[in-house]
Regions:
Chain A
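C-terminal lobe/tail of nucleotide-utilizing enzymes
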Residues: 1, 211-294
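Walker A (P-loop) phosphate-binding motif
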Residues: 2-29
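Short beta-strand-centered segment that lines the nucleotide-binding/catalytic pocket of NTP-utilizing
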Residues: 32-45, 117-122
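Conserved nucleotide-binding/hydrolysis micro-motifs of P-loop NTPases
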Residues: 39-41, 176, 198-200, 226-230, ...
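P-loop NTPase switch/communication element
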Residues: 42-61, 126
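Iron-sulfur cluster-binding cysteine motifs and their immediate structural context
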Residues: 77-94, 103-119
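Switch II (G3) loop of P-loop NTPases
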Residues: 139-141, 145, 154-180
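Inter-motif core of Ras-like GTPase G domains
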Residues: 180-199
């Protein structure tokens, strides 16, 4: 079971084309399980259009404190011990500020604090037509612990891969470099970074590559919308060489991609012969040979 | 519009939050308003790329972390049993701390029966202050690479609020706790979206986050290229006002890719931002402030 390889698609900056690329690669790779780890704003299911939800699992998030006014003696200890200023002068807990540390709960002399978990999201294992198993999740709006839900998605995905005898897991990651991203990339074999040739693109690219290297994960680069600014493409290729990244290729700006998005279709199905689709097939071929060496 | 917090969120990444926020800040500052720009996307802060502030202060952001006196420790396990974040593990002759899991709540310090734990600090990133074009006060937080605790750094950025200013707050993408922390004290939230099924899907989640917090919401549509009927239907049904529309335009993309403030190099879009400012004023009228 250790022969399962995991590839994660990340970007640092949002909106560079992670999901479009993952969606396209999903229809090219055989024998794989696909995971959407962007649990805040999952989109891949809109392209893959799962046939059937095989399993729905509830995700319980962290605990939150609530003060029972009937038992509260207004002694003020909770306000004193709370590092997050989450308790008001009239002893009401602000659930936005509450981190769920339990300090007020454990230290309240009147035992007036309730401290319980609540439903924070769902994780779905699905079947798709032609794309194999697909796992994604929905964090309830505004909830915490997205990193933990990502871990749940990844566990379910591994279980599915073992069950179905798949040797590849393809993960669509969240934007950023924080908690859910760390949870998405740790233990993977390759991070495919999708960037765009803009100053924000290169700024965020450097931070996500640093993150991958911090966790000793090999990184590969795809430059999307590559013809917007050739100067940055050059700079990115140079950066790639300096940092020893694998250069997977570039996808030119293609209006068909926007059209495909509007219909929530993978670009390879929508316009199989457009320049972007051809570029993605080349990237896929390179990925295949890299996979053999991983 | 003084002393107001205007937050920019989106759900989906890359819809143009920073572009809209930066240009509104520019427009307001150009119109003689006192503007503070706070970049709360601490994982990937980008506002400085366009506003190019001259930074004059860099402060490390720290989070409390326990320091365990192994001599006093009896390895009773109380600290690790109480820690909600699994940041402490008690072994027979040692207590291990996983600093990146620690939320700095200080419960272990208070719960230890031997008083063997004291409060230390660790760096999670830094805050930079500077001044940008037309006197815009600029602040951003930059999270250390490998550090998962974005929340406390966002709080740190928000401690820098300047009174009497219009505060433009750029939120991170997504719909979970960092976004909630960022928009929690906003007087109005501008949702920047794009007219695609993905943009709309994520917009709906972001709107419900802001609605749960009771915020007035306006929607800015970026990269509009003909009407996207499902978006129009959703906005109408939920009574959400469209407060700005920017067209899909290669020139805008090109200027963005050069790191330009749009209004500086493509001033023809000034009408859109004037309209945005007026519409935000209307949104605020529903709460506490007026122009």
């Amino acid at each position: 079971m250790t022969h399962i390889k995991e590839i994660v698609v990340v970007s640092g900056k949002g909106g560079t084309g992670k999901t479009s690329l993952t969606g396209a690669l999903s229809s090219l790779f055989r024998d794989k399980v696909i995971a959407d780890c962007d649990v805040d704003a999952a989109n891949l299911h809109m392209i893959l259009q799962p046939e059937e939800v095989l399993q729905t699992k509830e995700f319980t998030g962290g605990k939150k404190a609530r003060i029972d006014p009937d038992r509260c003696t207004k002694c003020g200890i909770c306000r004193e011990v709370c590092h997050y200023d989450a308790i008001s002068e009239d002893f009401v807990v602000d659930t936005v500020s509450c981190e769920g540390c339990g300090a007020c709960y454990f230290l309240c002399p009147a035992k007036a604090v309730n401290f319980s978990t609540r439903l924070a999201g769902y994780c779905y294992v699905c079947s798709t037509s032609g794309n194999g198993r697909f796992v994604f999740a929905e964090l309830l709006p505004g909830e915490e612990n997205s990193g933990k839900l990502v871990a749940m998605v990844r566990n379910e995905t591994r279980t599915e891969a073992e069950k179905t005898g798949s040797n590849l897991i393809l993960i669509d990651g969240p934007p950023g470099i924080g908690c859910p991203v760390i949870s998405s990339i740790t233990g993977t074999h390759l991070a495919v970074v999708v960037t765009e040739p803009t100053p924000t693109g290169i700024h965020d690219l450097k931070r996500i590559v640093e993150l991958a290297h911090h966790f000793q994960i090999k990184a590969a680069l795809v430059i999307n919308k590559s013809d917007i600014n050739p100067q940055y493409v050059q700079e990115m290729k140079q950066y790639c060489e300096e940092k020893g990244l694998i250069y997977l290729g570039e996808i030119p700006y293609e209006t068909q991609i926007t059209e495909a998005q509007k219909e929530a279709k993978a670009i390879l199905d929508f316009a199989p012969e457009c320049v972007a689709s051809r570029a993605i097939r080349e990237i896929y071929t390179k990925l295949q040979s890299i996979l053999e060496e991983l | 519009m003084r002393d107001t917090n205007i937050a920019f969120a989106s759900g989906k990444g890359g819809t143009g939050k920073t572009t809209v926020a930066v240009n509104l800040a520019y427009f307001l500052a150009y119109s003689q308003q006192q503007v503070q720009y706070l970049d709360c996307d601490v994982e990937e802060p980008n506002g400085h790329i366009f506003l190019k502030p001259e930074m004059d202060l860099k402060t490390p952001a720290k989070l409390m972390v326990p320091v365990i006196d192994q001599k006093k420790c009896t390895f009773c396990g109380e600290c690790s049993a109480h820690c909600q974040f699994n940041a402490l593990v008690t072994l027979p002759k040692n207590v291990l701390l996983f600093p990146e899991l620690c939320h700095g709540c200080g419960l272990c310090v208070r719960i230890c029966p031997e008083n063997a734990i004291t409060e230390g600090e660790r760096e999670i990133g830094y805050i930079e202050n500077g001044r940008a074009i037309h006197g815009i006060e600029f602040i951003h937080g930059v999270l250390n690479v490998g550090e998962p605790m974005a929340g406390p750094l966002i709080q740190e950025v928000k401690r820098q609020y300047k009174k009497q200013y219009v505060r433009i707050i750029d939120a991170p993408p997504g719909t979970s706790c960092p976004v909630v922390k960022t928009i929690a004290d906003a007087d109005a939230v501008v949702m920047v979206t794009e007219p695609t099924p993905f943009g709309l899907h994520d917009l709906k989640i972001a709107v419900s986050v802001a609605k749960n917090l009771g915020k007035p919401i306006g929607v800015a549509i970026n990269r509009q290229n003909g009407e996207f009927p499902p978006l129009v239907t959703y906005l109408l049904k939920n009574n959400l006002p469209v407060i700005m529309v920017l067209p899909e335009n290669r020139e805008i993309a090109r200027h963005y890719s050069m790191g330009n403030i749009l209004l500086q190099t493509l001033p023809i879009y000034i009408d859109q931002f004037m309209e945005l400012a007026v519409n935000i004023g209307r949104l605020l009228g529903k709460t506490k402030c007026r122009w």
